[in-house]
């Protein structure tokens, strides 16, 4: 199968991924007018492009032309699809239907931050590592709620890595290995 982007996309960075039996594909280059997210059902054949006036079809569960980030890959955690935008906003929608729960909430109104690393989730929380090295912790769910901010003290642009029981966070000067107390 294949589909054609509704408009030309200049640069594609977010990684496609699967959850809830759907394949999620996003492309939101900062210079593009439209920033597409598609949730694709399995079993497709042929051309599954979205046509004018459509936001879904037989093989596209949902589509939004203004929902994609530039650098971070979106996250599905529980039943929610989270979009972390490079310029410091977080949005949440239903992962299966695309219905918006909250849109583009400013992560930190007092200290605007950029985001390159992709978000991750653990034990009911969504985490976002800013380029300034601050990790923002949100309560997972349909309502936007910032719980806390952790500081690493250095510029961070790399995606955190999960390995075994550890979370690895790299910044400009340090590599942090974090795990739960036993």
What is the role of each PLM region?
Residues 1-182:
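Noncatalytic, solvent-exposed loop/strand surfaces
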């Amino acid at each position: 199968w294949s589909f054609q982007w509704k408009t030309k996309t200049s640069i594609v960075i977010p990684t496609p991924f699967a959850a809830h039996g759907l394949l999620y594909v996003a492309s939101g280059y900062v210079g593009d007018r439209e920033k597409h997210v598609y949730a694709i059902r399995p079993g497709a054949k042929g051309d599954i492009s979205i046509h004018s006036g459509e936001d879904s079809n037989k093989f596209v569960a949902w589509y939004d032309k203004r929902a994609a980030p530039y650098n971070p890959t979106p996250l599905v955690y529980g039943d929610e699809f989270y979009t972390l935008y490079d310029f410091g906003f977080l949005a949440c929608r239903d992962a299966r239907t695309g219905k918006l729960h909250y849109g583009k909430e400013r992560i930190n109104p007092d200290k605007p931050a950029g985001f390159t690393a992709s978000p991750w989730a653990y034990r009911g929380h969504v985490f976002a590592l800013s380029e300034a090295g601050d990790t923002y912790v949100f309560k997972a769910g349909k309502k936007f709620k910032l719980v806390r901010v952790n500081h690493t003290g250095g510029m961070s642009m790399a995606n955190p890595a999960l390995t075994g029981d550890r979370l690895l966070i790299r910044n400009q000067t340090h590599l942090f290995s974090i795990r739960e107390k036993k």
